[in-house]
């Protein structure tokens, strides 16, 4: 029998019927009660008591407690608070009675009172100081005085004051002064932390503590991000974290706009990989590398080789920071030219910004309502910042009336840390350059500058604007002359050197001037905009606290991300910029050419070493003592065939001394692949096997890349230029093409048909090859060859071939052929038609009625996208149509600009397909492109020059040019399609519209100009040759129609042709006689006037012409409608009514032609003195040395 569980409860271990309270430690119970009250739970009276406690101790109650307080009904709250007030009154009465009882107990009442008063005064004197402020009593206290009542004896009796401020610290510069008002009996203090019972006084105390800094504002200054610097720089930019994102975006755009290249890269990547993982990796790497080579040549080579053509006496150099150029020429010693340092001194201070300020000596003056406006006397001190306002006053803070009282707070501003901006003066930039001869150098002297200077194998010099030319003597090697153009390539007017703490940065001028920080000028000590680093906190009845913002150094450093870091102490070392020099080698000579060959044995002192630049350095030890003698050294492909391959960088190496075991360093460039370095003759010959990785095709590609990198470094200020294929003669003259550069280097002399056939042949050989590697190589090479032969490639620069009259932007060719017709292969496209349609809509709402095209290519772009824009406008319910009219005359300018917007219009597939077949109907409102000026859409309401080239794409028949909206307003032409060059005695300024050619014959003068169209933008100075100190009145092609401000745009005897026939089509400006006419120079000829056509309205030829002091042959304009003469050449004795005059005035409204308005008999009309005038020209001596100055510079392609 089993026993049932259970039983009496009393016998169980735990009696469930009589379970007692749990045993809890008393403190734990108290904690639980307090925590529940803090959470707002419990009796109302306890909650209100706890809130009162927090109020008295100036502690912040919890959110739950405040929530319970707000939920208490008004009547309940008033009931409990009234009882609190009664209890407080009882306590006050008890304290007062206690004081009276103690006084009654004393036997000697007068003595005790006197001693007590004396003790109080002594205590006050030890802890408190009394003075005057604003005509009232001022007590200066510390943190020990606020625990008790402060008693101040006055003539009216004791003045008892209570200070309950929580920011009282020890006395320091950070002080605050404000008024303690007088409160009458029975009034509780309200919005004051200091009050007295007899009369008001001012209180002053320091706010410093031993444990922490002064109170600071949590606010920070918003500093605009500096952004990526436009300068090409050798060093990494500061905190530059944006390049990776931008590069990925650039890769995406490149793939979208160059699908042919992207497809080719994907195919190559897929063929290179042996499994899917490798194929994906290779494809991604190729796609990432391709746009870097195509558009943004990252990284700079440390050493470049420049080969001078045979018989050359000079070579143009472009020296960059930390770069070294090795110059090799036939029958000349090899030179190393190194840019050692670019330094700017005597920087002028422009402005200082305060990024860390301190606030001291705060004082507040307050007034009651109806007692007048508060005035703080410290307002008169310029070092103080003051602020006036109003506060609520009443019985609880010392005023008899309730209302708004005036308050005036002042605080002293002082700057703790400041950032200083300095400007670089171009005349204070100096360049330190070193030249080293590849002569006989021992390993001990290699790199030893002092030893090489002693052996006349090296020299160091400084180039400044005041000393741009220098001649260096190199001992037995002769002498070398450098004529340098001291232009750093750094626009000193656009950048400042900004020093923040211990770091200095090169920052944009506009960004620097727009900083929202207090600033001061060097000539002043007063800070402006000081309130940016100060915060006036909320005003209380008689007190207002002022705090300073924390240091903004971190924010500045963050905002400077992308700026270039520079070193600055008393001078700044620049890492951006370049120096153009012409190195004259006519007086250089090889040393040791008459020495005999060394006959004894050589040995390799060390194994040959790769320099990393494709060359090898060999240290040889010579056992003989028959020196000086020449070293027989050569590089051969095979020991059985001693035909030299490769070349010597150290030209004519020799042993300089007759001592045995002398060591010599020799540098040579072996060929790609396997070769042997052979030293010595006969049985004493030694050799060393050498393998050089790479290929000739790869070198051609890297050579082109070098030219692209140099262009990236120089920007638009200088560009070495040579004709197609010139890469074999001068690496520094590589054509700026990337993929196509190597292609044209190897196959540039062939026609595209031959190139295509060769590619097809390689493809056929690849298909039939048995070896897989060879087949893939043939297929890849043939495919690339066919692709490059049949496509027009992309690029970002323009090149000029003067002899072939050819200009290339990308590979699109702009040919000026024998019949002087322009053939272009360019097509302008907007970034996206959807965004352009939205931009047009936005501009129309802002009052822009249309646009004026800058060039005919832009006009063609509007024609091409007109229907698509109209469909987009119609699909988005916009009653507006784009109307493109035929341009009349030259392309005129307009004052307004289109503005960028991030919004886009949307269009469905159905509407897009319909737009291909049908043009949309014309809307009620129109947006007019070009055409004649009308009352409906005058030029003053049109936009112009709103687009700029963003990128170049590719196509089968044309180079695609992608346009984007300009961010800034400018009148300059787009520099992306401009090329400028000097070669020999010919200088050219050219773009897709102009070919302006000048020649040198005793002096430089304009020879010819061909205009595809005439535009109204201004030629940028960055693409202008010889543009120093040019008078606009001497420019034959006016600068208002894109005439370059260059001395190449001049001709003796002629002034600016502002009234030439610029509205005609197909203009060719040259210097010759119009058919069937003659021109004579006579003083009786009439003065300048608008250009006149040589045929009348009826077609009759005007044969006789004259000029006052022009030069012959005369200036003429050949157009589609006939031949015109320049403004100086006038018809002789002809009916004025039948003449066909030019109706153009290229000058703007405020400009006046001074020559047409000159006195009779003076063709020039200019203010030059007779001693200065030569044939109507003012004689200006050339800044570079007279008539040969322009030829003294190799102005190569910009």
Curated annotation (Swiss-Prot):
Q: Where in the chain are disulfide-linked cysteines found?
A: 297-324, 354-410, 354-415, 368-399, 386-410, 386-415, 484-581, 598-629, 798-809, 849-937, 973-1017, 1074-1123, 1085-1106, 1107-1110
- List GO terms (cellular component aspect): extracellular region; host cell endoplasmic reticulum membrane; membrane; viral capsid; viral envelope; virion membrane
Fusion peptide: annotated span:
392-405
Q: Which Gene3D superfamilies match?
A: 1.10.10.930, 1.20.1280.260, 2.60.40.350, Flavivirus envelope glycoprotein M-like (1.10.8.970), Flavivirus polyprotein propeptide domain (2.60.260.50), Tick-borne Encephalitis virus Glycoprotein, domain 1 (2.60.98.10), Viral Envelope Glycoprotein, domain 2 (3.30.67.10), Viral Envelope Glycoprotein, domain 3 (3.30.387.10)
Query: What GO annotations for molecular function exist for this entry?
Result: protein dimerization activity; structural molecule activity
InterPro entries this protein is in? Answer: Env_glycoprot_M_flavivir, Env_glycoprot_M_sf_flavivir, Flav_gly_cen_dom_subdom1, Flavi_capsidC, Flavi_capsidC_sf, Flavi_E_Ig-like, Flavi_E_Stem/Anchor_dom, Flavi_E_Stem/Anchor_dom_sf
Q: Name one GO biological process term.
A: fusion of virus membrane with host endosome membrane
Write out the transmembrane intervals: 110-130, 254-274, 280-294, 747-767, 774-794
Task: Tell me the segments the record calls region Disordered.
Answer: 1151-1177
| Record propeptide residues | 106-127
Question: Which residues does the annotated region (Interaction with host EXOC1) include?
Answer: 2-15
Q: Quote the PTM field.
A: Genome polyprotein: Specific enzymatic cleavages in vivo yield mature proteins. Cleavages in the lumen of endoplasmic reticulum are performed by host signal peptidase, whereas cleavages in the cytoplasmic side are performed by serine protease NS3. Signal cleavage at the 2K-4B site requires a prior NS3 protease-mediated cleavage at the 4A-2K site.
UniProt-annotated glycosylation sites, renumbered to this chain:
142, 448, 924, 1001
Question: Site positions for Cleavage, renumbered to this chain?
Answer: 105-106, 127-128, 219-220, 294-295, 794-795
Q: Where is this region: Hydrophobic?
A: 37-72
Which keywords does this chain's UniProt record carry?
Capsid protein, Clathrin-mediated endocytosis of virus by host, Cleavage on pair of basic residues, Disulfide bond, Fusion of virus membrane with host endosomal membrane, Fusion of virus membrane with host membrane, Glycoprotein, Host endoplasmic reticulum, Host membrane, Host-virus interaction, Membrane, Secreted, Transmembrane, Transmembrane helix, Viral attachment to host cell, Viral envelope protein, Viral penetration into host cytoplasm, Virion, Virus endocytosis by host, Virus entry into host cell
Comment field on protein domains: The transmembrane domains of the small envelope protein M and envelope protein E contain an endoplasmic reticulum retention signal.
Protein name listed in UniProt: Structural polyprotein
Q: Which organism is it from?
A: Japanese encephalitis virus (strain SA-14) (JEV)
């Amino acid at each position: 029998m089993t026993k049932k569980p259970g039983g009496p409860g009393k016998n169980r271990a735990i009696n469930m019927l009589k379970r007692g309270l749990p045993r809890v430690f008393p403190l734990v119970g108290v904690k639980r009660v307090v925590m529940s009250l803090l959470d707002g739970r419990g009796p109302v009276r306890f909650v209100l008591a706890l809130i009162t406690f927090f109020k008295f101790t100036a502690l912040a109650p919890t959110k739950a407690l405040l929530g319970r307080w707000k939920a208490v009904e008004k009547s309940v709250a008033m009931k409990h608070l009234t009882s609190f007030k009664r209890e407080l009154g009882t306590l006050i009465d008890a304290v007062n009675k206690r004081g009276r009882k103690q006084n009654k107990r004393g036997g000697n009442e007068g003595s005790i009172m006197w001693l007590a008063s004396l003790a109080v005064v002594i205590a006050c004197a030890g802890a408190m100081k009394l003075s005057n402020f604003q005509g009232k009593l001022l007590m200066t206290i510390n943190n020990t005085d606020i625990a008790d009542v402060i008693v101040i004896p006055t003539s009216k009796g004791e003045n008892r004051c209570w200070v309950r401020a929580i920011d009282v610290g020890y006395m320091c510069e950070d002080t605050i002064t404000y008024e303690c008002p007088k409160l009458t009996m029975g009034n509780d203090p309200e919005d004051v932390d200091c009050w007295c019972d007899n009369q008001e006084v001012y209180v002053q105390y320091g706010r410093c503590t031993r444990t922490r800094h002064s109170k600071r504002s949590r606010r920070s200054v918003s500093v605009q991000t500096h952004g990526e610097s436009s300068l090409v720089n050798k060093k990494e930019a500061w905190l530059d974290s944006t390049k990776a994102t931008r590069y990925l975006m650039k890769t995406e755009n490149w793939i979208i706009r160059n699908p042919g290249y992207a497809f080719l890269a994907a195919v190559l990547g897929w063929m290179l990989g042996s499994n899917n993982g490798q194929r994906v990796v290779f494809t991604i790497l190729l796609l990432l590398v391709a746009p870097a080579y195509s558009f943004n040549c990252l990284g700079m080579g440390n050493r470049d080789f420049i080969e001078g053509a045979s018989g050359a006496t000079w070579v143009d150099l472009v020296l960059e920071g930390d770069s070294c150029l090795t110059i090799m020429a036939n029958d000349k010693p090899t030179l190393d030219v190194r840019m050692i340092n670019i330094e700017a001194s005597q920087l002028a201070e422009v402005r200082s910004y305060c990024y860390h300020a301190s606030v001291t000596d705060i004082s507040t003056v307050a007034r009651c309502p109806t007692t007048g406006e508060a005035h703080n006397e410290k307002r008169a001190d310029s070092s103080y910042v003051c602020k006036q306002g109003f506060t609520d006053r009443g019985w609880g803070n010392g005023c008899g009336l309730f209302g708004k009282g005036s308050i005036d707070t002042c605080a002293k501003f002082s700057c703790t840390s400041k950032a200083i901006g300095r400007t670089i003066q171009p005349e204070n930039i100096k360049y330190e350059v070193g030249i080293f001869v590849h002569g006989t150098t021992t390993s001990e002297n290699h790199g030893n500058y002092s030893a090489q200077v002693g052996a006349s194998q090296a020299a160091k010099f400084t180039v400044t604007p005041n000393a741009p030319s220098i001649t260096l003597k190199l001992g037995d090697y002769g002498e070398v002359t450098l004529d340098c153009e001291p232009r750093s390539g750094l626009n000193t007017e656009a950048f400042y050197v900004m020093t923040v703490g211990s770091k200095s940065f090169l920052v944009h001028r506009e960004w620097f001037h727009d900083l929202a920080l207090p600033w001061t000028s060097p000539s002043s000590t007063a800070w402006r905009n000081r309130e940016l680093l100060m915060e006036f906190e909320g005003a209380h009845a008689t007190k207002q606290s002022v705090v300073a913002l924390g240091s903004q150094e971190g924010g500045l450093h963050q905002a400077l991300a992308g700026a270039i870091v520079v070193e600055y102490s008393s001078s700044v070392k620049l890492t951006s910029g370049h120096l153009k020099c012409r190195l004259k080698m006519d007086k250089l000579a090889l040393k040791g050419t008459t020495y005999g060959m060394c006959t004894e044995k050589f040995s390799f002192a060390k194994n040959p070493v790769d320099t990393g630049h494709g060359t090898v350095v060999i240290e040889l030890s010579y056992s003989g003592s028959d020196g000086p003698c020449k070293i027989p050294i050569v590089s051969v492909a095979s020991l059985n065939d001693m035909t030299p391959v490769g070349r010597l960088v150290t030209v004519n190496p020799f042993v300089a001394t007759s001592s045995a075991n002398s060591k010599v360093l020799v540098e040579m460039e072996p060929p790609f692949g396997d070769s042997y370095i052979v030293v010595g003759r006969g049985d004493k010959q030694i050799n060393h096997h050498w393998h050089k990785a790479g290929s000739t095709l790869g070198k051609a590609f890297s050579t082109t890349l070098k030219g692209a990198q140099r262009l990236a470094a120089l920007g638009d200020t200088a560009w070495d230029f040579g004709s197609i294929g010139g890469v074999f003669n001068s690496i520094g003259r590589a054509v700026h093409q990337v993929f196509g550069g190597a292609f044209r280097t190897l196959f540039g002399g062939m026609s595209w048909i031959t190139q295509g056939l060769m590619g097809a042949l390689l493809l056929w050989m690849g298909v039939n090859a048995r070896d897989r590697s060879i087949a893939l190589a043939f297929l890849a090479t043939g495919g690339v060859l066919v692709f490059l032969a049949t496509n027009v490639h992309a690029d970002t620069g323009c090149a000029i071939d003067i002899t072939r009259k050819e200009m290339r932007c990308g590979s699109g060719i702009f040919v000026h052929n024998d019949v002087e017709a322009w053939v272009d292969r360019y097509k302008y496209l907007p970034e996206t038609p959807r965004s352009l349609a939205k931009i047009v809509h936005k501009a129309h709402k802002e009052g822009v009625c249309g646009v004026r095209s800058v060039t005919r290519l832009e006009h063609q772009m509007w024609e091409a996208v007109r229907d698509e824009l109209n469909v987009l406008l119609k699909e988005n319910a916009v009653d507006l149509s784009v109307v493109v009219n035929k341009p009349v005359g030259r392309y005129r300018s307009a004052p307004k600009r289109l503005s960028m917007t991030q919004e886009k219009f949307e269009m469905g597939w159905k509407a897009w397909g319909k737009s291909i077949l049908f043009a949309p109907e014309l809307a009620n409102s129109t947006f007019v492109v070009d055409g004649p000026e009308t009352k409906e859409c005058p030029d003053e309401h049109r936009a112009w020059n709103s687009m700029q080239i963003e990128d170049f794409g590719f196509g089968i028949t044309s180079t695609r040019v992608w346009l984007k909206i300009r961010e800034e307003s400018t009148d300059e032409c787009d520099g992306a399609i401009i090329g400028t060059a000097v070669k020999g005695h010919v200088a050219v300024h050219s773009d897709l519209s102009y070919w302006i050619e000048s020649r040198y014959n005793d002096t430089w003068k304009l020879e010819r100009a061909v205009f595809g169209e005439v535009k109204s933008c201004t030629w940028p100075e960055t693409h202008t040759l010889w543009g120093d100190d040019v008078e606009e009145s001497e420019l034959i092609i006016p600068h208002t129609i894109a005439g370059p401000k260059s001395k190449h745009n001049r001709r003796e005897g002629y002034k600016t042709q502002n009234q030439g026939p610029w509205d005609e089509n197909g203009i060719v400006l040259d210097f010759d006689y119009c058919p069937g006419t003659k021109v004579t120079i006579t003083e009786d000829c009439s003065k300048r006037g608008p250009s006149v056509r040589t045929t009348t309205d009826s077609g009759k030829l005007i044969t006789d012409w004259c000029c006052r002091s022009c030069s012959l042959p005369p200036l003429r304009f050949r157009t589609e409608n006939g031949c015109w003469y320049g403004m100086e050449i006038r018809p002789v004795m002809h009916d004025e009514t039948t003449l066909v005059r030019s109706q153009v005035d290229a000058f703007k409204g405020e400009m006046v032609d001074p020559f047409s308005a000159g006195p009779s008999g003076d063709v020039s009309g200019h203010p030059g003195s007779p001693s200065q005038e030569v044939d109507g020209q003012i004689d200006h001596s050339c800044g570079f040395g007279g008539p040969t100055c322009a030829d003294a510079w190799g102005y190569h392609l910009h």
